[in-house]
Regions:
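C-terminal regulatory/interaction module of P-loop NTP-utilizing enzymes
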Residues: 1-273
């Protein structure tokens, strides 16, 4: 009813339910609207809302706040990790001090508002360092996800990337991170997480995992060859008009592709003279 003529919304104030009438008033709605749903379908803000609002994408207003955005991944994951969970209920400055310590800075115990044993401090530092690695991967995934979602299908040279680098992903990985992990175990944890995420996509699990490996610079020689094959086939099908278009469109696309190939051969011959 918030989007229609009623302009009403149900809420809770001081433990009691009430209805808020927002007719004639300006208000702000914050919502998580990903370009794609978890199944890989395009997400659309309902017209009843989009036609009556100024819509701002986080990516459009993030400039200059990248560090704060990156830190928000750590802050939102605190309660998901057994070692870091106590920090969620303590002075926020304790987290900032622990983050600085995990980055290699010298932090005096007097800067902490709560008492931490040496073992607890060491475990928190180790887990935070692991989460920095996870966070950096998720930020790359998120950037590619947004870039791919904003690209028109007509200009794609490779399949769309639909794996997400969200707070939800961060929390799911963070709950399995322990201080004793080594670098390889951490990379394997990320691999396993995204292997499971890829299975929720309606199509394209393989191609998305290969793109992820490329982003992480972890493509094997065989995977690199397979990824190149998939991209070449994607471009070939697109040049032919796609898999679902009518025969005339496909024929036109094929002839257009032949023309482009002949032009490339002509240019190569002229360049060799």
């Amino acid at each position: 009813s918030l989007c229609d003529a009623q302009r009403k919304i149900e809420g809770v104030w001081k433990g009691k339910t009430r209805t808020y009438d927002l007719r004639g008033k300006k208000f702000c709605v914050c919502m998580a609207g990903n370009p794609y749903t978890e199944s890989g379908e395009k997400f659309q803000i309902p017209d009843m809302l989009a036609n009556r609002a100024d819509t701002y994408n986080l990516g459009d207003v993030l400039s200059g706040r990248e560090e704060a955005f990156g830190l928000s991944y750590i802050e939102n994951a605190l309660t998901s990790n057994a070692v870091l969970a106590p920090l969620a209920g303590r002075d926020p400055q304790d987290l900032m001090a622990m983050v600085r310590r995990a980055r290699g800075e010298s932090v005096a115990t007097s800067e902490l508002s709560s008492d931490y044993s040496a073992a607890e401090t060491s475990a928190i530092t180790a887990v935070l360092r692991h989460l920095f690695v996870v966070r950096d991967v998720l930020l790359r995934v998120n950037a590619e996800y947004v870039r791919s979602a904003s690209q028109a299908d007509a200009y794609r040279t490779e399949p769309p990337f639909k794996l997400q680098g969200s707070y939800r992903n961060m929390n799911k990985i963070a709950e399995k991170v322990v201080a004793a992990m080594n670098a390889q175990e951490l990379e394997t944890l990320i691999d396993d997480h995204y292997r499971g995420e890829a299975q929720t996509l309606t199509t394209g699990a393989e191609q998305n995992l290969l793109k992820l490996a490329e982003l992480r610079e972890r493509l094997s020689e065989a995977e690199a060859a397979r990824w190149a094959q998939i991209k070449a086939e994607f471009r070939r099908q697109k040049s032919m008009g796609g898999a679902e278009d009518d025969p005339v469109t496909r024929l036109t696309g094929t002839l257009s592709g032949l023309g482009a190939e002949l032009a490339a051969i002509r240019d190569a011959v002229l360049a060799a003279r």
